[in-house]
């Protein structure tokens, strides 16, 4: 248990940031799931549209520190590769 005032404040602050980060991570998963569902259905146009919506969300998460920038880039790259393979 935190004893000092600053430690108590830090605990409150961490709880708030954790809630924000959890919400953002959940939102990212939803966007990625939509892309993966579109890929599974084989609809190239729908998958491309879903990817276009998911990409800024992933990069925003990297900017906000929810995930590492390399992780976000890797996820975007792999999704784009799978969407592109639908047209071939």
Curated annotation (Swiss-Prot):
Record bears the keyword RNA-binding: yes
Keywords for the protein's UniProt record, in alphabetical order: Ribonucleoprotein, Ribosomal protein, RNA-binding, rRNA-binding
Organism: Rhizobium meliloti (strain 1021)
InterPro entries noted in UniProt: Ribosomal_bS20, Ribosomal_bS20_sf
PANTHER family hit by this protein: 30S RIBOSOMAL PROTEIN S20, SMALL RIBOSOMAL SUBUNIT PROTEIN BS20C
Function description: Binds directly to 16S ribosomal RNA.
UniProt record similarity statement: Belongs to the bacterial ribosomal protein bS20 family.
Region (Disordered) location: 1-23, 65-88
One GO process term, biological-process aspect: translation
Name of this protein: Small ribosomal subunit protein bS20
GO molecular function: small ribosomal subunit rRNA binding; structural constituent of ribosome
GO CC terms: cytosol; small ribosomal subunit
Gene3D superfamilies, sorted: Ribosomal protein S20 (1.20.58.110)
């Amino acid at each position: 248990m935190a004893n000092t005032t600053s430690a108590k404040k830090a605990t409150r602050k961490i709880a708030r940031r954790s809630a924000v980060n959890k919400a953002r991570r959940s939102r990212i998963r939803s966007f990625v799931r939509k892309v993966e569902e579109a890929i599974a259905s084989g609809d190239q146009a729908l998958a491309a549209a879903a990817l276009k919506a998911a990409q800024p969300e992933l990069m925003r998460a990297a900017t906000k520190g929810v995930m590492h920038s390399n992780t976000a880039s890797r996820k975007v790259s792999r999704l784009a590769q799978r969407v592109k393979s639908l047209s071939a």
